[in-house]
UniProtKB/Swiss-Prot annotation:
Complex formation: Oligomerizes as a right-handed, spiral filament on DNA at oriC.
UniProt binding sites for ATP: G185, G187, K188, T189
Protein name per its UniProtKB record: Chromosomal replication initiator protein DnaA
Subcellular location: Cytoplasm
Designated gene of the protein: dnaA
Length: 484
């Protein structure tokens, strides 16, 4: 039995050197040693899909490793045994990735891995006799390139930065939960990942998990399909820190919202840190349960806005320095003046500057900058979804034509029911087809307040669920807007 465990450990150590952290985590984290004879090692997989995929991807390589290590007669057999997988927890004497003791080719070289959680893998290294690796909790989806040190601060993001750094130093103490909100490409993910990396550095025993809302949803759906919801709950409710990116992607998805609600409560009651990001304030989320929105507002909600000119210049200068670009400061200032959208676009502009310099061997002037800006705009349009391609004027024209209204009607203060309803619909469509905030939408619709616009959006959202006629009208208007 022990010899079989040692051989399986040897296989794991060899394979992990050949795979990325993410791949190793996905395919081997939930495999468990069950039993062994002189000729056969049995490994438990959580479900038939996982078993089949591991066999398809790695059976040949595992056999090669066995031959390389002098175990020609031994076979590794994978078994679909979810019950065995569930019972092999951290206290189990059976071997898994949580307790790997890998025997190398000679007794003088032994590597012992002590991995204390299921979600975390650390790179394999060679150690001399009796050396131990006390691995920390390592999230394979945390990217080391995101740090507080390389996050450039300014008036638009200083509060979010300070709060994030404070959370990393003292998780679960002050700002719990914390929600960072703002538009696309402004640095929300950078801060979220920086929190994870700094916390990992300062609190090595912490179980930290960074996950996008999309992956959180997909994992939840898969757990239902494979009857593994208990495993899913255990994974997320026994963390020290949950970093959930882009929660707006969970709008209109009631099942996962319910699961997140209970996960939130479990972590909150245990004083475990939670940080979320969103492209809008919680109050502006559509088809999102009120009780979950109220949970987000329990702690700190902090926004990141578009960078001002000085910050844009600083971002561009740093990117130019990293890329080894030498151009006059006047050119960098010109880029900062023209690209006012977000950090992502600023960095894209610098990348294109470098391409023009390297490939065309030309001096950058104002006409080149203008050309680059146009390329960025085209690129963004080509890669955004249909909603973002729709401009405000297109939406307005459809509303006026189909509802037989005038500019004065839609932007005025008439209390006529049909005109009031049209303004509600206009606000709703602007929110769904653009990235405008409620304040920006309010300015378009005759200077309405944030609360008025939010009321309009929520009203139409609810009516679509209860009124078939309204729902059909909205669908018809959306189809016409998409054709513009």
């Amino acid at each position: 039995m022990q010899e079989g465990k040692n051989i399986w450990s040897l296989i794991l150590a060899a394979i992990r050197k050949e795979l990325s952290e993410e791949e190793f985590y996905i395919w081997f984290e939930n495999l468990y040693f069950i039993d062994a004879t002189d000729e056969n090692i049995k490994i438990s997989a959580p479900n038939s899909f996982h078993k089949n995929q591991v066999e398809k991807r790695f059976a040949k390589r595992i056999k090669e490793i066995l031959i390389e290590k002098g175990h020609n007669t031994i076979n590794v057999e994978f078994i679909n045994s979810p019950n065995d997988s569930k019972t092999h927890n951290m206290e189990s004497k059976n071997i898994s990735l949580k307790d790997i003791s890998t025997q190398q080719d000679s007794p003088e070289k032994r590597t012992t891995f002590k991995i204390h959680t299921k979600n975390i893998i650390e790179s394999t290294k060679q150690y001399t006799t009796k050396e131990e690796i006390h691995t920390k909790y390592r999230n394979p989806f945390l990217k080391k390139k995101y740090t507080f040190e390389n996050f450039i601060t300014g008036p638009n993001n200083k509060l979010a930065y300070n709060a994030s750094l404070s959370i990393a130093k003292n998780p679960g103490k002050k700002y719990n939960p914390c929600l960072i909100y703002g538009g696309v490409g402004l640095g929300k993910t950078h801060l979220l990942q920086s929190i994870g990396n700094k916390t990992e550095e300062l609190h090595k025993e912490f179980k930290i998990l960074y996950v996008t809302a999309e992956n959180f949803l997909n994992e939840f759906v898969e757990s239902i399909k494979t009857n593994e919801t208990k495993r899913f709950k255990k994974k997320y409710r026994y963390l020290d820190m949950l970093l959930l990116d882009d929660i707006h992607d969970l709008q209109k998805k009631e099942g996962i919202q319910e699961e997140l609600f209970h996960t939130f409560n479990a972590l909150y009651e245990d004083n475990k840190q939670m940080v979320f990001t969103c492209d809008r304030q919680p109050s502006e989320l559509i088809n999102f349960t009120d009780r979950l929105k109220s949970r987000f507002t329990r702690g700190l909600n902090v926004d990141i806005s578009k960078p001002n000119f000085e910050l844009r210049v600083a971002i561009i200068e740093k990117k130019a320095e990293e890329d080894g670009i030498k151009v006059p400061k006047s050119i960098l200032n010109l880029v900062a003046k023209k690209v006012t959208t977000n950090i992502r676009d600023l960095e894209a502009a610098v990348t294109k500057l470098k391409a023009h310099i390297d490939l065309e061997d030309i001096e950058i002037d104002t006409s080149t900058v203008d050309k680059i800006i146009k390329e960025i705009i085209v690129y963004e349009n080509d890669n955004t979804n249909t909603h973002n391609k729709i401009n405000i004027e297109s939406i307005k024209k459809v509303i006026l034509r189909e509802l037989k209204l005038t500019n004065k009607d839609i932007e005025g203060n008439s209390k006529k029911p049909e005109i009031t309803k049209a303004r509600h619909i206009y606000a709703y469509l602007l929110r769904n087809f653009t990235e405008l905030s409620t304040i920006e939408i309010g300015k378009i619709i005759g200077g309405k307040t944030h609360s008025t616009v939010l009321y309009s959006i929520n009203k139409i959202d609810k009516e679509r669920n209860n009124d078939l006629e309204i729902n059909n009208l909205i669908i018809e208007l959306m189809n016409k807007i998409n054709k513009k």
